Protein backbone atom coordinates (compact mmCIF):
# COMPACT_ATOMS: atom_id res chain seq x y z
CA UNK A 1 0.00 0.00 0.00
CA UNK A 2 1.56 3.23 -1.15
CA UNK A 3 2.07 5.94 1.44
CA UNK A 4 0.79 8.60 -0.98
CA UNK A 5 -2.69 7.05 -0.74
CA UNK A 6 -2.83 7.42 3.04
CA UNK A 7 -5.60 9.78 4.16
CA UNK A 8 -4.84 9.70 7.88
CA UNK A 9 -2.18 8.20 10.14
CA UNK A 10 -1.74 7.70 13.88
CA UNK A 11 1.56 6.02 14.75
CA UNK A 12 1.92 2.98 12.50
CA UNK A 13 -1.82 2.73 11.77
CA UNK A 14 -3.02 4.26 8.50
CA UNK A 15 -6.36 4.82 6.81
CA UNK A 16 -7.07 5.01 3.07
CA UNK A 17 -10.31 6.85 2.28
CA UNK A 18 -10.79 5.48 -1.27
CA UNK A 19 -10.89 1.85 -0.13
CA UNK A 20 -11.94 2.52 3.48
CA UNK A 21 -9.10 0.27 4.65
CA UNK A 22 -7.04 0.44 7.85
CA UNK A 23 -3.58 -1.12 8.01
CA UNK A 24 -0.31 -1.16 9.94
CA UNK A 25 2.60 0.10 7.83
CA UNK A 26 4.89 -2.41 9.58
CA UNK A 27 2.59 -5.35 8.73
CA UNK A 28 0.21 -4.31 5.91
CA UNK A 29 -0.71 -7.94 5.20
CA UNK A 30 -2.56 -8.23 8.53
CA UNK A 31 -6.05 -6.78 8.09
CA UNK A 32 -7.94 -4.55 10.52
CA UNK A 33 -11.71 -4.52 10.81
CA UNK A 34 -13.38 -1.15 11.20
CA UNK A 35 -15.63 -0.54 14.20
CA UNK A 36 -18.65 0.15 11.96
CA UNK A 37 -18.07 -3.01 9.88
CA UNK A 38 -17.79 -5.11 13.03
CA UNK A 39 -21.06 -3.77 14.46
CA UNK A 40 -22.80 -4.36 11.11
CA UNK A 41 -21.95 -8.08 11.48
CA UNK A 42 -24.29 -8.20 14.47
CA UNK A 43 -27.21 -6.42 12.81
CA UNK A 44 -29.97 -8.48 11.24
CA UNK A 45 -29.04 -9.02 7.57
CA UNK A 46 -31.01 -6.93 5.07
CA UNK A 47 -32.54 -9.12 2.36
CA UNK A 48 -32.30 -6.69 -0.55
CA UNK A 49 -33.84 -9.16 -3.01
CA UNK A 50 -36.95 -9.76 -0.87
CA UNK A 51 -37.56 -6.14 0.13
CA UNK A 52 -37.09 -4.77 -3.39
CA UNK A 53 -39.58 -7.40 -4.64
CA UNK A 54 -41.93 -6.45 -1.79
CA UNK A 55 -41.80 -2.74 -2.72
CA UNK A 56 -42.15 -3.51 -6.45
CA UNK A 57 -45.31 -5.56 -5.86
CA UNK A 58 -46.73 -2.80 -3.65
CA UNK A 59 -46.18 -0.38 -6.53
CA UNK A 60 -47.92 -2.63 -9.08
CA UNK A 61 -50.96 -3.74 -7.05
CA UNK A 62 -54.13 -1.87 -6.20
CA UNK A 63 -54.53 -0.75 -2.59
CA UNK A 64 -57.06 -3.51 -1.81
CA UNK A 65 -54.96 -6.26 -3.42
CA UNK A 66 -51.84 -5.08 -1.61
CA UNK A 67 -53.64 -5.19 1.75
CA UNK A 68 -54.35 -8.90 1.10
CA UNK A 69 -50.79 -9.83 0.06
CA UNK A 70 -48.84 -7.65 2.48
CA UNK A 71 -49.57 -9.66 5.63
CA UNK A 72 -48.57 -12.97 4.04
CA UNK A 73 -45.30 -11.54 2.72
CA UNK A 74 -44.38 -10.05 6.10
CA UNK A 75 -45.13 -13.34 7.86
CA UNK A 76 -43.07 -15.54 5.51
CA UNK A 77 -40.38 -13.05 4.36
CA UNK A 78 -40.37 -15.04 1.11
CA UNK A 79 -41.35 -13.89 -2.37
CA UNK A 80 -42.66 -16.33 -4.98
CA UNK A 81 -42.99 -14.92 -8.49
CA UNK A 82 -45.96 -17.23 -9.08
CA UNK A 83 -48.02 -14.56 -7.35
CA UNK A 84 -47.60 -12.35 -10.43
CA UNK A 85 -49.86 -14.54 -12.57
CA UNK A 86 -52.69 -14.13 -10.05
CA UNK A 87 -52.76 -10.41 -10.83
CA UNK A 88 -51.88 -10.60 -14.56
CA UNK A 89 -48.53 -8.89 -13.98
CA UNK A 90 -45.87 -9.77 -16.55
CA UNK A 91 -42.45 -10.76 -15.28
CA UNK A 92 -40.89 -8.03 -17.44
CA UNK A 93 -43.04 -5.35 -15.80
CA UNK A 94 -42.24 -6.73 -12.36
CA UNK A 95 -38.49 -6.91 -13.08
CA UNK A 96 -38.53 -3.32 -14.34
CA UNK A 97 -40.33 -2.13 -11.20
CA UNK A 98 -37.93 -4.05 -8.94
CA UNK A 99 -34.87 -2.66 -10.75
CA UNK A 100 -36.33 0.83 -10.40
CA UNK A 101 -36.54 0.30 -6.63
CA UNK A 102 -32.93 -0.96 -6.47
CA UNK A 103 -31.68 1.97 -8.59
CA UNK A 104 -33.52 4.47 -6.37
CA UNK A 105 -31.95 2.92 -3.25
CA UNK A 106 -28.47 3.07 -4.80
CA UNK A 107 -28.89 6.73 -5.78
CA UNK A 108 -30.25 7.64 -2.35
CA UNK A 109 -27.26 5.93 -0.71
CA UNK A 110 -24.80 7.70 -3.04
CA UNK A 111 -26.33 11.12 -2.37
CA UNK A 112 -26.48 10.43 1.37
CA UNK A 113 -22.79 9.43 1.49
CA UNK A 114 -21.79 12.52 -0.49
CA UNK A 115 -23.80 14.80 1.81
CA UNK A 116 -22.34 13.09 4.89
CA UNK A 117 -18.78 13.54 3.63
CA UNK A 118 -19.36 17.25 2.98
CA UNK A 119 -20.87 17.86 6.43
CA UNK A 120 -18.10 15.92 8.19
CA UNK A 121 -15.47 17.99 6.36
CA UNK A 122 -17.28 21.22 7.23
CA UNK A 123 -17.50 20.26 10.91
CA UNK A 124 -13.84 19.19 11.01
CA UNK A 125 -12.70 22.49 9.49
CA UNK A 126 -14.86 24.47 11.91
CA UNK A 127 -12.97 22.93 14.85
CA UNK A 128 -9.62 24.02 13.40
CA UNK A 129 -10.86 27.53 12.61
CA UNK A 130 -12.39 30.47 14.44
CA UNK A 131 -15.75 28.66 14.76
CA UNK A 132 -14.32 26.14 17.26
CA UNK A 133 -16.18 27.48 20.30
CA UNK A 134 -19.43 27.60 18.30
CA UNK A 135 -19.02 23.95 17.26
CA UNK A 136 -18.15 22.83 20.80
CA UNK A 137 -21.24 24.59 22.15
CA UNK A 138 -23.33 22.25 19.99
CA UNK A 139 -22.03 19.48 22.27
CA UNK A 140 -22.63 21.49 25.44
CA UNK A 141 -18.92 22.25 25.89
CA UNK A 142 -17.58 25.67 26.88
CA UNK A 143 -14.18 27.06 27.79
CA UNK A 144 -10.84 27.28 26.04
CA UNK A 145 -9.59 24.18 24.21
CA UNK A 146 -6.48 23.57 22.16
CA UNK A 147 -6.61 21.94 18.73
CA UNK A 148 -3.54 21.02 16.68
CA UNK A 149 -3.97 19.72 13.14
CA UNK A 150 -2.74 16.11 12.70
CA UNK A 151 -1.71 15.94 16.38
CA UNK A 152 -2.40 12.48 17.80
CA UNK A 153 -0.83 12.38 21.28
CA UNK A 154 -3.59 12.38 23.90
CA UNK A 155 -1.61 14.62 26.23
CA UNK A 156 -3.31 17.99 25.75
CA UNK A 157 -4.85 19.04 29.06
CA UNK A 158 -7.80 20.71 27.32
CA UNK A 159 -7.71 19.28 23.82
CA UNK A 160 -9.96 18.81 20.83
CA UNK A 161 -9.12 16.04 18.35
CA UNK A 162 -11.30 16.01 15.19
CA UNK A 163 -11.48 12.85 13.06
CA UNK A 164 -9.23 10.99 15.50
CA UNK A 165 -7.91 7.66 14.18
CA UNK A 166 -7.98 5.06 16.95
CA UNK A 167 -6.93 1.41 16.92
CA UNK A 168 -6.62 -1.59 19.20
CA UNK A 169 -4.62 -4.79 18.72
CA UNK A 170 -5.05 -7.50 21.34
CA UNK A 171 -1.90 -8.82 23.05
CA UNK A 172 -2.08 -12.05 21.02
CA UNK A 173 -2.56 -10.06 17.79
CA UNK A 174 -5.86 -11.78 16.95
CA UNK A 175 -8.16 -8.80 17.42
CA UNK A 176 -7.24 -5.89 15.12
CA UNK A 177 -9.75 -3.07 15.37
CA UNK A 178 -9.70 0.51 14.04
CA UNK A 179 -12.00 3.46 13.52
CA UNK A 180 -12.27 7.23 13.48
CA UNK A 181 -13.86 9.38 16.17
CA UNK A 182 -15.56 12.40 14.61
CA UNK A 183 -14.89 14.59 17.64
CA UNK A 184 -12.83 13.71 20.71
CA UNK A 185 -12.83 16.30 23.49
CA UNK A 186 -10.40 15.84 26.39
CA UNK A 187 -10.75 17.93 29.55
CA UNK A 188 -8.09 16.61 31.91
CA UNK A 189 -8.92 12.90 32.04
CA UNK A 190 -12.59 13.47 31.26
CA UNK A 191 -13.49 12.33 27.76
CA UNK A 192 -16.41 13.36 25.56
CA UNK A 193 -16.92 11.50 22.28
CA UNK A 194 -19.05 13.13 19.60
CA UNK A 195 -20.30 11.71 16.33
CA UNK A 196 -22.02 13.47 13.43
CA UNK A 197 -24.93 11.64 11.81
CA UNK A 198 -26.49 12.92 8.60
CA UNK A 199 -28.96 10.18 7.69
CA UNK A 200 -32.68 10.78 7.25
CA UNK A 201 -33.67 9.85 10.80
CA UNK A 202 -32.54 8.26 14.04
CA UNK A 203 -34.63 5.21 14.94
CA UNK A 204 -34.79 4.79 18.71
CA UNK A 205 -36.71 1.52 18.33
CA UNK A 206 -36.53 -1.36 15.87
CA UNK A 207 -39.40 -2.57 13.74
CA UNK A 208 -41.84 -5.21 14.93
CA UNK A 209 -40.83 -8.77 14.05
CA UNK A 210 -44.00 -10.73 13.24
CA UNK A 211 -42.25 -14.08 13.75
CA UNK A 212 -41.08 -13.33 17.31
CA UNK A 213 -43.98 -10.98 18.16
CA UNK A 214 -41.51 -8.43 19.51
CA UNK A 215 -39.19 -5.67 18.34
CA UNK A 216 -36.35 -7.00 16.19
CA UNK A 217 -33.14 -7.64 18.12
CA UNK A 218 -29.50 -7.66 17.09
CA UNK A 219 -27.68 -10.97 16.65
CA UNK A 220 -26.11 -12.94 19.52
CA UNK A 221 -24.42 -11.94 21.79
CA UNK A 222 -26.07 -8.53 21.37
CA UNK A 223 -29.62 -9.87 21.27
CA UNK A 224 -30.56 -7.76 24.29
CA UNK A 225 -30.37 -4.67 22.05
CA UNK A 226 -32.98 -3.47 19.57
CA UNK A 227 -31.77 -3.71 15.98
CA UNK A 228 -32.11 -0.01 15.12
CA UNK A 229 -29.57 2.58 14.05
CA UNK A 230 -29.56 4.24 17.49
CA UNK A 231 -28.38 0.96 19.07
CA UNK A 232 -25.72 0.62 16.36
CA UNK A 233 -24.51 4.17 17.02
CA UNK A 234 -24.45 3.63 20.79
CA UNK A 235 -22.28 0.56 20.21
CA UNK A 236 -20.02 2.52 17.86
CA UNK A 237 -19.36 5.30 20.37
CA UNK A 238 -19.10 2.79 23.23
CA UNK A 239 -16.45 0.84 21.31
CA UNK A 240 -14.44 4.03 20.81
CA UNK A 241 -14.77 4.74 24.56
CA UNK A 242 -13.58 1.21 25.39
CA UNK A 243 -10.59 1.59 23.05
CA UNK A 244 -9.65 4.92 24.64
CA UNK A 245 -9.76 3.40 28.12
CA UNK A 246 -7.45 0.64 26.89
CA UNK A 247 -5.00 3.37 25.83
CA UNK A 248 -5.33 5.08 29.21
CA UNK A 249 -7.34 3.37 32.00
CA UNK A 250 -7.46 6.69 33.87
CA UNK A 251 -9.70 8.21 31.21
CA UNK A 252 -13.23 8.87 32.48
CA UNK A 253 -15.99 8.69 29.88
CA UNK A 254 -18.05 11.78 30.62
CA UNK A 255 -20.47 11.61 27.68
CA UNK A 256 -21.17 9.95 24.34
CA UNK A 257 -23.08 12.24 21.99
CA UNK A 258 -24.75 11.93 18.59
CA UNK A 259 -25.17 15.20 16.74
CA UNK A 260 -27.85 14.51 14.10
CA UNK A 261 -28.47 16.80 11.11
CA UNK A 262 -31.47 15.47 9.19
CA UNK A 263 -32.26 16.09 5.53
CA UNK A 264 -34.30 19.19 6.40
CA UNK A 265 -31.37 20.69 8.31
CA UNK A 266 -32.88 20.08 11.75
CA UNK A 267 -30.25 19.51 14.45
CA UNK A 268 -30.78 17.15 17.41
CA UNK A 269 -28.37 16.05 20.14
CA UNK A 270 -28.71 12.51 21.53
CA UNK A 271 -26.98 11.27 24.69
CA UNK A 272 -25.86 7.62 24.43
CA UNK A 273 -25.31 5.03 27.14
CA UNK A 274 -21.82 3.58 27.54
CA UNK A 275 -22.52 -0.05 26.61
CA UNK A 276 -19.22 -1.37 27.94
CA UNK A 277 -20.51 -4.87 28.75
CA UNK A 278 -22.01 -5.24 25.28
CA UNK A 279 -18.78 -4.07 23.63
CA UNK A 280 -16.73 -6.64 25.55
CA UNK A 281 -19.21 -9.43 24.70
CA UNK A 282 -19.09 -8.46 21.02
CA UNK A 283 -15.29 -8.36 20.89
CA UNK A 284 -14.93 -11.67 22.72
CA UNK A 285 -17.42 -13.33 20.37
CA UNK A 286 -15.74 -11.88 17.27
CA UNK A 287 -12.31 -12.95 18.49
CA UNK A 288 -13.55 -16.52 19.02
CA UNK A 289 -14.91 -16.51 15.45
CA UNK A 290 -11.51 -15.43 14.08
CA UNK A 291 -9.74 -18.20 16.01
CA UNK A 292 -12.24 -20.80 14.70
CA UNK A 293 -11.65 -19.61 11.12
CA UNK A 294 -7.88 -19.79 11.59
CA UNK A 295 -8.14 -23.34 12.96
CA UNK A 296 -10.39 -24.33 10.05
CA UNK A 297 -7.83 -23.02 7.54
CA UNK A 298 -5.04 -24.96 9.26
CA UNK A 299 -7.07 -28.19 9.03
CA UNK A 300 -7.72 -27.59 5.34
CA UNK A 301 -4.00 -27.15 4.64
CA UNK A 302 -3.08 -30.58 6.01
CA UNK A 303 -5.78 -32.44 4.04
CA UNK A 304 -4.51 -34.49 1.07
Can you describe what each PLM-predicted range is?
Residues 52-56, 60, 213-215, 289-291:
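Short, surface-exposed secondary-structure junctions/capping segments
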Residues 4, 100-222:
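Catalytic cores of nuclease domains that cleave nucleic-acid phosphodiester backbones
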Residues 29-30, 63-71, 168-176, 249-251, ...:
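Intrinsically disordered, low-complexity coil segments
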Amino acid sequence: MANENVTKQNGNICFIEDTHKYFDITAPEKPFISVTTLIHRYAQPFDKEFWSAYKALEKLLSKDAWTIEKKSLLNTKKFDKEILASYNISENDFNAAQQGILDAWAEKNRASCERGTQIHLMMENSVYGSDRSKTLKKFGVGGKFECKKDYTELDLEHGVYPEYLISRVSKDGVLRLAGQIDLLIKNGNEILIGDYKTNEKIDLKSGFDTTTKSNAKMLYPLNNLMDCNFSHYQLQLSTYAWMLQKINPEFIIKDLLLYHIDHQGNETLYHCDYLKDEVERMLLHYKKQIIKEQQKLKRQRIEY
